[in-house]
Amino acid sequence: MDERLSLLRSPPPPSARHRAHPPQRPASSGGAHTLVNHGYAEPAAGRELPPDMTVVPGDHLLEPEVADGGGAPPQGGCGGGGCDRYEPLPPSLPAAGEQDCCGERVVINISGLRFETQLKTLCQFPETLLGDPKRRMRYFDPLRNEYFFDRNRPSFDAILYYYQSGGRIRRPVNVPIDIFSEEIRFYQLGEEAMEKFREDEGFLREEERPLPRRDFQRQVWLLFEYPESSGPARGIAIVSVLVILISIVIFCLETLPEFRDEKDYPASTSQDSFEAAGNSTSGSRAGASSFSDPFFVVETLCIIWFSFELLVRFFACPSKATFSRNIMNLIDIVAIIPYFITLGTELAERQGNGQQAMSLAILRVIRLVRVFRIFKLSRHSKGLQILGQTLKASMRELGLLIFFLFIGVILFSSAVYFAEADDPTSGFSSIPDAFWWAVVTMTTVGYGDMHPVTIGGKIVGSLCAIAGVLTIALPVPVIVSNFNYFYHRETEGEEQSQYMHVGSCQHLSSSAEELRKARSNSTLSKSEYMVIEEGGMNHSAFPQTPFKTGNSTATCTTNNNPNSCVNIKKIFTDV
């Protein structure tokens, strides 16, 4: 044993010391030692390296190392075969995160295809896999002195271009979108790069909806806002749909001659209608009290439900400002305003001894606003939501369509007016009068109420119809593509709703990957919800506390402290 110790402590031969060539030796900070591997051989079985040491391969085999700066020569020797010696570097060397990246080059092997770049290129993004020396060290191959990744080769051209261009991400045309998305996640380019990629590919950013902080408020919000959350929520949605349908039916039926209020439609009511209304059982509505009218009673009940639903949702919503800016909530407000205006007008007429309190035209416009209640059905209809999302995403194309139609209408209405100017039987008395004909012709409707009679006018009409077909056909494929995207996103089981509740903890970036895994591994049915609560807790432990929303159970990870449980919450549901 003493002989072996003396052999290990003996200095190496001078000839070997002169042949040594110092390799790159980045050292880790914090007082940790850096070990230099001088051979291809793996460490002996049972030998483990300390967790705070970084292994850096040397350039030469079976040769001792001479430290830069005149350090003492290493101690130890090599047996016959491969040598497996490690040596702590002097503490004066730079740390791993502070190494000089200017002139050094690195070789990256992607499934047999080698790429060579400079370390300073990778160091531009230290938060990524290739930019962080500690993260990429696990993929280092000491036999070939290169980094090896068994990944998609065509995708790495774009990944390396991301570093070379300073953050520009472009998908190769021969790489599918899903594969390139996985490569972005593997190389840990970050959420910003993923968002840029999705925007360039035409994906819309998924809307994140916050949940209320209080449990009772959250339960009420889910009950009235998300019908799939529980059985009672579906029941409330059914009641709301029935009330909307009843309100629309009443709005239509009260315009029939048998039920029409004569004082509201004096100009449009014929003598036959008066006679029919007089012979009907409800023909005396004009003389009867409006408060006892059956239509008014049913309308009042519908308005009571609409008002109750709107107030409950307003007080339970997580953000009053966001709630007030939502277009669907504005429609709810517009749907109930005409009732209160009509009620106030009726009361004013009673106090004024039957004198008309408001212009009849204004009153009709106010009552017409009631028809917007039909848009309340979109809250409970996926088809209407898809249509609304399609129109919203296609606003640019629709704007171009309207602009093209406007140019065509001006052009062809002017042309047909001058072409028909010499014919006294022509119906085109002016250019604005020809606007209607141009719109009807370009949209290929062709009512026939106005038509050219001269040869020149017919030629203009033919060109107008052809131009209309071409103009309308140009933006239609883009609109159809948007519709297909939203339709398949709804029907292929992708994420339907995403609600985020951000508490005091701000660890958003660390939790994004776990949320994506939970979304991809989700096996929930349409009526089930999974609540993932993350933050300053142990994610691997997952102690669960169920919270009920009707007939569905949501699991909440707690840390023996319910107040600190909710930091980031997302609810996922599959169709």
From Swiss-Prot:
The modification Phosphotyrosine is found at residue 499. N-glycosylation promotes the cell surface expression. A motif (Selectivity filter) lies at residues 444-449. A lipid is attached at residue 317 (S-palmitoyl cysteine). It holds the Pfam family BTB_2. The modification Phosphoserine is found at residue 520. InterPro entries: BTB/POZ_dom, Ion_trans_dom, K_chnl_volt-dep_Kv, K_chnl_volt-dep_Kv1, K_chnl_volt-dep_Kv1.3, SKP1/BTB/POZ_sf, T1-type_BTB, VG_K_chnl. The N-terminus may be important in determining the rate of inactivation of the channel while the tail may play a role in modulation of channel activity and/or targeting of the channel to specific subcellular compartments. This is Potassium voltage-gated channel subfamily A member 3. The lineage of its organism: Eukaryota, Metazoa, Chordata, Craniata, Vertebrata.
